Amino acid sequence: MKPVIALVGRPNVGKSTLFNRLTKSRDAIVADFAGLTRDRHYGNGKLGKHEYIVIDTGGFEPDASSGIYREMAKQTQQAVAEADVVIFVVDARAGLSAQDHDIANYLRRLGKPCLLVGNKAEGMREGVQLAEFYELGLGEVLPVSAAHGQGVRSMLESALDTLQLPEPEDEPEDGEDKPIRLAVAGRPNVGKSTLINTWLGEERLVAFDMPGTTRDAISVPFERNGQQFELIDTAGLRRKGKVFEAIEKFSVVKTLQAIESANVVLLLLDATQGVTDQDAHIAGYILESGRAVVLAVNKWDAVDDYGRQMLERSIETRLSFLKFASLHFISAKKRQGLGPLWTSIAQAHKAATCKMPTPVLTRLLLEAVQFQAPKRSGMFRPKMRYAHQGGMNPPVIVIHGNSLEHVTDAYKRFLEGRFRKEFDLVGTPLRIEMKTSRNPFAEDSDA
């Protein structure tokens, strides 16, 4: 088991910057706004042979009583409960605060291994300027600069040393049991976090009744029927033209990255709002990224029969380019219709990673041509010879022959239908590439 390290501290002391150092990523949003990270955010890191998990948390105020700050405090308490060691981050430049005392008192009561870290300590005389933090009663203050990387390795070594870890065994090579990365995507406030929380049985993501509450792409380990998943809530997308704060712009980028890194994307729509332009744009990006996709309409219980008919018609017309995807009608809050989603998710992943033998593809191609040959274009009639698989996730079929640049889009769709039916490719895009054989005499004739 990888040891778990939780980063705890009041808002804006640099926990997310330190998280990025420890995970060598920019997975956590970093900006100069207090209260930016509001959920537990998991990342992987490695020091020598030792791998570890880091949890980044929202700014912790143990006695927070108002709205979303109370939710952030609860998330942080759960992160501390999950951790093997806690790194309590304070702001060396701002000095000791009453909040720091409150957090220290809370951590001391838990009796869990804890390191006190003074961040933003670059250029400081640690003996003098960090002395006040000894009042917290947590022992030595480790000076670091997360922004510049100073002292971070020494701090990490100290954290891992407290756990007295055995030497790790060599891990087996990657196999087919790797987790399926599932991105839950959609506009703000369509119920993405509510759906994941329902699946997990705990309030893992802050699900607050206001658009844009989840501002980061949060990854959560999860198991279903023996299959490992990584669930990603993708920080509800908004139209780029309406994004004003730097924080929201960064979240849009993280959402697009999460979609691209996923194996399967669950696109969540809001039954009470219909299919919006932004829904169509997100769907288009998923298709462009080549991700397997499942469509789910949330809040289905909140619309009447007429509204449902109009919504189904809207999906057929506005999202016609995703007609290969399974469609589900659910209520995340009432736990209605959630079971069949997993069947479609597994089916979409299986289709996206399907292996298609060259002899079978070639047979299907030649049978299709015999049934309906491609149309002649002027002097040229496309001649198709054989096909092979060119990639997975999404599946790519490469067709070889002559004059294939003249094959129409309509004929490509005809071929796509034949291939989809044979291999049961439900829930995944299918790309067909035409590769025209070069005429060896063409260049000589130009000489």
Swiss-Prot record:
Keywords: GTP-binding, Nucleotide-binding, Repeat, Ribosome biogenesis
Span of domain KH-like: 353-438
GO terms for MF: GTP binding; ribosome binding
Sites where the protein binds GTP 1: 9-16, 56-60, 119-122
Presence of keyword Chaperone: no
Domain EngA-type G: 3-167, 180-353
GO biological process: ribosome biogenesis
One of the Pfam families matching this protein, by short name: MMR_HSR1
Taxonomic superkingdom: Bacteria
Gene3D superfamilies, A to Z: 3.30.300.20, P-loop containing nucleotide triphosphate hydrolases
Cited InterPro entries: G_ENGA, GTP-bd, GTPase_Der, KH_dom-like, KH_dom-like_a/b, P-loop_NTPase, Small_GTP-bd
Residues the entry annotates as binding GTP 2: 186-193, 233-237, 298-301
Family, per entry: Belongs to the TRAFAC class TrmE-Era-EngA-EngB-Septin-like GTPase superfamily. EngA (Der) GTPase family.
Subunit structure: Associates with the 50S ribosomal subunit.
Function: GTPase that plays an essential role in the late steps of ribosome biogenesis.
Protein name: GTPase Der
Organism (species): Paracidovorax citrulli (strain AAC00-1) (Acidovorax citrulli)
Name of the gene encoding the protein in the UniProt record: der
